[in-house]
């Protein structure tokens, strides 16, 4: 294992393997402890896309909230559907919600807000690319979640896990923004492992991962956008050897997107010593 890989593995907290029962218990307890340590928290809010990550985070949140209620805490889990117009995999969103059984479901169509924002920018002489429009969608979704959390006296739960974090495969202040990130420390295959343990419908964690933010490239697979497979990313994070090409791609993503993993720099934190 190279020096940089060793640094990355330690930073990303991924273990070579996880035991499903204890790992699930550890994440649920983390969520419960956070809520119980902040008396103002009355809800957990999370956007549900129908993919692996939000399905897992949603299930763990609902399980944690169920236990909190049993302990006498006033708390609820709010699942948010955030389509941009018609969502191509809307059926899988419904399947995820049926599996999660959230306390409350809220639906907000982000299309009017995103389109108006893009039009206003265009009128100001700022013409966004399709990729940049995708980031607008991600940020609008997170804005909505924070609005709901504020109204419901709660916090926003993120779906960021270590295979996304290491590559910076998320929108800064979009899906990368949240109050807690309970999946951090897991890689992609470990997330699948926990969903299998929690008896999730197989098609929700075996579907091809996609951010699906670009109109010109609908359902673009994550692995195609990243230029490397999740299997290689997972192997790298578990401290295993990967091809020199995959290693270079992963480490380039890690270095290039370091700013996404930091809070806003100040004159006291940049340049780093």
UniProtKB/Swiss-Prot annotation:
GO biological process, one term: NAD biosynthetic process
Gene3D superfamilies listed in its UniProt record: HUPs
Catalysed reaction equations from the record: deamido-NAD(+) + NH4(+) + ATP = AMP + diphosphate + NAD(+) + H(+)
Subunit: Homodimer.
Keywords, sorted A to Z: ATP-binding, Ligase, Magnesium, Metal-binding, NAD, Nucleotide-binding
Family: Belongs to the NAD synthetase family.
Function: Catalyzes the ATP-dependent amidation of deamido-NAD to form NAD. Uses ammonia as a nitrogen source.
Enzyme class (EC, first level): ligase
Pathway assignment: Cofactor biosynthesis; NAD(+) biosynthesis; NAD(+) from deamido-NAD(+) (ammonia route): step 1/1
Pfam families attached to this UniProt entry: NAD_synthase (PF02540)
HAMAP family associated with the record: NadE_ammonia_dep
EC numbers, comma separated: 6.3.1.5
Lineage: Bacteria, Bacillati, Bacillota, Bacilli, Bacillales
Binding site for Mg(2+): 53, 164
The protein's name: NH(3)-dependent NAD(+) synthetase
Annotated positions binding deamido-NAD(+): 139, 172, 179, 259-260
Cellular component aspect of the GO annotation: cytoplasm
GO function terms (MF aspect): ATP binding; glutaminase activity; metal ion binding; NAD+ synthase (glutamine-hydrolyzing) activity; NAD+ synthase activity
Annotated source species: Staphylococcus saprophyticus subsp. saprophyticus (strain ATCC 15305 / DSM 20229 / NCIMB 8711 / NCTC 7292 / S-41)
Binding residues annotated for ATP, in chain numbering: 47-54, 159, 188, 210
UniProt entry tagged with the keyword Nucleotide-binding: yes
């Amino acid at each position: 294992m190279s020096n940089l890989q060793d640094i990355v593995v330690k930073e990303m907290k991924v273990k070579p393997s996880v035991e499903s029962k204890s790992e699930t218990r550890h994440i649920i307890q983390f969520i419960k402890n956070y809520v119980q340590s902040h008396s103002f928290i009355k809800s957990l809010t999370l956007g549900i896309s129908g993919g692996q990550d939000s399905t897992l985070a949603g299930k763990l949140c609902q399980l944690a909230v169920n236990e909190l209620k049993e302990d006498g805490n006033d708390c609820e889990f709010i699942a948010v559907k955030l389509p941009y117009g018609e969502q191509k995999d809307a059926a899988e969103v419904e399947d995820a919600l049926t599996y999660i059984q959230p306390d409350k479901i809220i639906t907000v169509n982000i299309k009017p807000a995103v389109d108006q924002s893009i039009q206003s920018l265009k009128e100001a002489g700022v013409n966004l690319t399709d990729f940049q429009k995708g980031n607008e969608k991600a940020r609008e979704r997170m804005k909505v979640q924070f609005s709901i959390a504020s109204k419901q006296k709660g916090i926003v739960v993120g779906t960021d896990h270590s295979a996304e974090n290491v590559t910076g495969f998320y929108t800064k202040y979009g899906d990368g923004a949240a109050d807690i990130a309970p999946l951090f420390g897991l890689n992609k295959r470990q997330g699948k492992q926990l969903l299998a343990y929690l008896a999730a419908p197989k098609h929700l964690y075996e579907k091809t991962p996609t951010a699906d933010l670009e109109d010109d490239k609908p359902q673009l697979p994550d692995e195609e956008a990243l230029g490397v497979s999740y299997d290689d990313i997972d192997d790298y994070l578990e401290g295993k050897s990967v091809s020199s090409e995959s290693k270079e791609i992963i480490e380039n993503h890690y270095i290039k997107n370091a700013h996404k993993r930091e809070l806003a720099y100040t004159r006291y934190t940049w340049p780093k010593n």
